[in-house]
Amino acid sequence: MGKAMLKLCITLMVLVFSGTAESKGVMRREDESFPHLKSRLCGGLNGLGEDAYRSHCVVYYTKRMGVVSLDHVEELANHCLRIVKQCCAEGAADDCLQTELAAVQEQVCTRMSEAKDVPLVGRCCALAGSERHDCFHHAGGVAEGEGAWPHALPVTSPPEYDSVTVCALHATANARLYDTLLWEFSRRYPSASDSHLIALANEFITGLTTCCLVEEEHGACLATLREDFKHKLTEASHKSQNLCKALKSLGKEKFEDRIIVRFTQRAPQAPFELIQKLAHRFEVLAEKCCELGHSDRCLVEERYTVDDELCLEQSFVATCPRLSSCCSLSGSSRAQCLETVPVLETSDKASPATPTLPISEQCTLWAGKPVEFHKRVVWQISHRYPTTGVAQVEALAHHYLEHLTICCASEDKDTCIATEVAEFKSEVEKVHTKSDWWCRMSDLLGTDRFNLLLIVTYSQRVPQATFEQVEEISHHFALITRKCCSHRKNGSCFLEERYALHDAICRDEAWLSGLAEVSRCCAMDGRARILCFDELSSHLNASVEERPELCSTSLCSKYHDLGFEFKQRVAYGFGQRFPKAAMGQMRDLISKYLAMVQRCCDAMSDFKMDVEEVELRAHRLCLDAHQLGEEKLADRIMIGLAQRISVASFVNISSVALHFAQSVIKCCDADHEKTCFMEQEFALEDQVCSDSEALSHIPSVSRCCELHPFDRSVCFHSLRSTQASTLASTHVAVGKDDSLPGHVEECQAFASGNHSLTDQVMFEFARRHPRASVSQVESLARLYSELARACCALTDADQESCLHTARSQARQEALKSLQRSERICNTLSAIGKEKFEDRIVIALSQKATDASFEQILEIANRMSRGLARCCEQGNNVGCLMDHRHALHEAICSTPDGSLPQSVAACCNTSNTSTTTSTTTSTTTSTTTSTTTSTTSTTTAAEIRDSCFDNLQANVSRAHAPFYSNSQLCLMKLRTPHRFLERFLWEFGRRHPQAALSQVEELAEMYVKMTDSCCGKLHSKSCFTEQRHTIHMEIRHAYAEVQHICGSLHSRGEETFIQREVTLLSQKAPNASFEKVSQLARHFLSLAKKCCAPDHAAGCFLEEPYAIHDEVCRDDEVVDQVGGLATCCRMSGTSRAKCLAQLPRDLGRHGNRETPEFDELKICELRRDNPAVLMEKILYEFGRRHSDSAVSEVKNFAQKFSHSVTECCTSEKTHECFVEKRAAIEKVIKDEEAKGNLTCQRLKAQGVEHFEQLVILNFARAAKSLPMEKVVEFAHRFTRIAGQCCEHDTHCLIDESFHLHAEMCGDHGYIMAHPGVANCCKSDVSEQGTCFKIHEDVHHAEEILSKDVSPAHPTAERVCLRYRQFPEKFINLALFELVHRLPLLESSVLRRKALAYTGFTDDCCRAVDKTACFTEKLEAIKSS
């Protein structure tokens, strides 16, 4: 069977399809000799490599025998590869192929019955003897009348697998999956070039890799991938159909001329003879494909076919090393490589654009071989200008040959041709000038504005075109311009937009089939085609409206929904309306029109929002009326009045408030609620101005009442802003104030149950804080009233001092609110409303994870407007708008029915009754100090706030959102103003525990990815690479979380706090110890919440970001540390860099290495509170070594702590401290010297080399660690070392300390190795010995279990990993080798690992991969 299959394979290699461009080294061409066949086959094998060659075999056999199963095709392909290797091996007989071919024909027809269904095979097998031999050897493809590939399947994308099946197949049988894709694509498109089919399979499996290994939303990703491929295949089919129409309309000669231009531009290094031969082959292939009658399956693309043919010309490829390396690739990888091969000529030594032969020889060739000479002229111009359009090359060639004809008939040929060449050069210079202009405009205007310019230009030139056609052509020309302008340095940019426009039109199926006149013009070339299109444009002007659409609701809907496309459509419409207008004038008109639309739509949007807000406020007012009752509603109205008219008395204000409350209740009666359009602010003003007895007699109020309603509102606003108290005078509201009764009157009022005192307190707070929310004023007043009520329960002697304390406490709460408000307003002022609203979007998304994007935007906009109003005064006078409180207010102000389920329950708490629990304890004391009662009152607002704080986030979503590349580019184009916000929402709801700045950074990374990749020539690879980077960033963050939680679980809270104290003291060395300790405990509470089982899935708490957020939230720290306020206005990496560059002011602390303590105090602290002592020591060491590793700082802190213990119990305390300090300073200097050596090694070796050696050291020191952990720990250490080494001094880094710290921070590792837990609890200096003992025990257990080293992964698995992430493969090699050869030096192991990575590429191409790996591994072991 084996021999038969061998012969069968050889036979099929020369079977059919001879004379075509499908010659990837796997078939024989017509009349081709066996020596030449062997040369081609062996050249293809050597050029492609075994893996790619086998892929071509799979494609070839599937195309020829599509009815055969995949198993049979794979068997044929494997035999094919083995035979070619056998016959191409050194020492193989010259007649190897011929000998095999002579004996296989009978085997094909007798052993492969299913192949007879293929028409050509069946026809040959029906013959006998020499006729059969001739049929197999000389058949020229599908016979006439037999039809094209009857076994071909319908045109669709590959079969639809469910995500679980295809991802499992991808993980376990990647090679089989790849063969399946090749088989499926080849059955559906048997006319496509091998390279094209391989490119499709490669792209599809790359997409599968992304969906299965990177993206977590597998189903959505695969569905999008299939849709993209359906579109891609349809587009490729349309290109082929257009090619067929071009061939039919132009004729063979002109078509071949155009192919010469394309092929020359594709391979400018190739000689004319080779280009001509390739162009002819492509013309034959295209003609054959287009005559088959199956154009929907005819995938013939120029670039893949020319690449196939070019790479088979080994004699030429061998002269170009870069070209040779490209040809070793396949599919789109090879296409991309060839596109980046540099043109050989430079501007100084560029080839001429006209033939260099003497005039006599030119005339002879032109007269004797006009067709060939015409092609040579076309080649010469294309060779010189590889970026120009086909039509322009044809026009220049026609121009030159016309004048050559005249010169050849002239008596003085030399003078004539010299004149012609000069004129030709002048013509070329004109085009160069135009090209430079387009390049300058492209650079000057940028992508979007340049696109608008093109749309205007093309809509003027072709007014009968649809918007979609103009937009597509503009995009095409923009890509050409970008490519052309990148070649300006070598003088090859040769671009004129008219020719590019007409080339694009003539390639467009819709144009060719839609207008007969267009087809007629496209059949012409050069200037004739230009004139034809000019005439066409002048006779076919589109009928358009005289004026563009003015402001309307429909126009604003388009403006908001279409985004940038709206601008494109405006440019298109203006170009149609004014085809003769100057471009500068058009730009001015379009700019003015767009500005008008923006103003109009902004005004309409503001008005609509104002109306909605009034309706919403009226609705909320009615809800308050129904739920609170008249008295409580009057209290709230009183607060609003006091804020607006701070000059009025309490009596007047309360009277008007009560009257207005009655009006509201009447307005909100059940029969009128839907029509009650009452906004409290304006209605109150009406009430005030109509009440002549209460307030209107006040001069300032009377003056406001005389104004127009809008001006009146402004006037009342100015009243409250000018009368408001400043931050410094806030204490008046709760301090000694004539408007407040004395303590006797207060207590009498409380005893009688009179609520007027509480109302009076609310009034005083309201008039001093005119921009505070009503609930905040109520909260402050309630706090004071409850404290005062508790004071009144004391004896008369203690009441006054107690009330004074109560007022001070209320004053402090007010001051805190003012400070928070001031911080909010300062932040808003510093980062702007847009950036501030972005942060609100994140906070809302994290709170309401099931809310839609539109809901989040609406709430965020309302909240940002409210905060902006609160902060509209420059000095933020009286603004008590707490961000947390305002956030919840904004969420709950959403109309009923549209609230997300997750937050509806919290908002409904405001409808419940107030829960009050009061515990009163009275203590009478004869001293002046009095312990007041403890009163706890939980209001509805506080219940709501608590509910929001404890919301259980829905974290079942993937870590990163999935949008296809095309979706991202379309979203960026259509809604650029909402693009960033969408990803803030996406990342916020996926990571509800993440630091705000971390969410910002991830969203910005997505935006930058889209900006940089959309419209690029290699956008797919750009997206793939950057998506991987983002996913790795997320995985790294989750690894950080696991490390934090592992550290918390394994070491306990006390040790965790010590670690945070160290980190915080390093991040903010100028902050006080008390503040650092407080922040460390706050971060512990965050970590405990984050590391709880119900939050672990959504926990995205990366330490540096969280620490930065906490530091920046603390007003005291921000005030203490110079420059911190500026940094805190930034976010993400920008803020981290800013904080890293803050100056460390440690000069006043004396010795940099070792902190100095008061010996008496430190011994007292050790006795009374040893935990705080350790924190203080860590704080002092941390701030002195702000760039060092935490484990290093902790090591010396522990040494110092032991010294304190020893010295405090010594009789000679002072002498002991002096001695111990000196010893520790010496050790620190020694460690710094080691750190300097590490930094020198890092600088000399480079980051990559350094990290590889760290991987080896970690894997050798901790054989119990899996590879992923070793790589993760080594990467983190390299990053820390890099940061530490940026500063020349005081760098403490040690690999062993870092490794042990990482192992102790990995909860999963500790659970798997319980013995490590004891090591982690010991002192840092003692951990090394403990870990060594553990590793020795682990190694002994492995020996007993006869599993000394991990088994080598299967060859297929190694190759899968290598193909997917080749840049990370070196890590696997390092890890494997250090476990197998542990006694070798790290530098030697690294060299072997690099060698291993090098031969992996070869072994993964080999047929017997396992044997190849075995042989190579044995070789490097013995080397």
Swiss-Prot record:
Binding site for Cu cation: H36
Annotated segments matching region 7 X 4 AA tandem repeats of S-T-T-T: 913-939
One of the record's GO molecular function terms: metal ion binding
Predominant subcellular localization, coarse grouping: secreted
Propeptide: 24-29
GO cellular component, one term: cytoplasm
Positions in coiled-coil regions: none
Domain Albumin: start-end pairs: 29-230, 231-426, 427-608, 609-811, 812-1031, 1032-1226, 1227-1422
Disulfide bonds: C42-C88, C87-C96, C109-C125, C124-C135, C167-C212, C211-C221, C244-C290, C289-C298, C311-C327, C326-C337, C363-C408, C407-C416, C439-C485, C484-C493, C506-C522, C521-C532, C556-C601, C622-C668, C667-C676, C689-C705, C704-C715, C747-C792, C791-C802, C825-C871, C870-C879, C892-C907, C906-C947, C969-C1014, C1013-C1022, C1045-C1091, C1090-C1099, C1112-C1128, C1127-C1138, C1163-C1208, C1207-C1216, C1239-C1285, C1284-C1291, C1304-C1320, C1319-C1330, C1359-C1404, C1403-C1412
PROSITE patterns registered for this protein in UniProt: ALBUMIN_1 (PS00212), ALBUMIN_2 (PS51438)
Sequence repeat coordinates: 913-916, 917-920, 921-924, 925-928, 929-932, 933-935, 936-939
Glycosylation sites: N490, N541, N652, N754, N908, N911, N954, N1070, N1236
SUPFAM superfamilies in the record: Serum albumin-like (SSF48552)
Keyword field: Cleavage on pair of basic residues, Copper, Disulfide bond, Glycoprotein, Lipid-binding, Metal-binding, Repeat, Secreted, Signal
Region listing for Disordered, in residue ranges: 910-936
Tissues in which the UniProt entry reports expression: Plasma.
Source organism, top-level taxon: Eukaryota
Transmembrane segments: none
Family: Belongs to the ALB/AFP/VDB family.
PANTHER family for the chain: AFAMIN, SERUM ALBUMIN-RELATED
Purpose: Serum albumin, the main protein of plasma, has a good binding capacity for water, Ca(2+), Na(+), K(+), fatty acids, hormones, bilirubin and drugs. Its main function is the regulation of the colloidal osmotic pressure of blood.
Protein name: Serum albumin SDS-1
Gene (UniProt): SDS-1
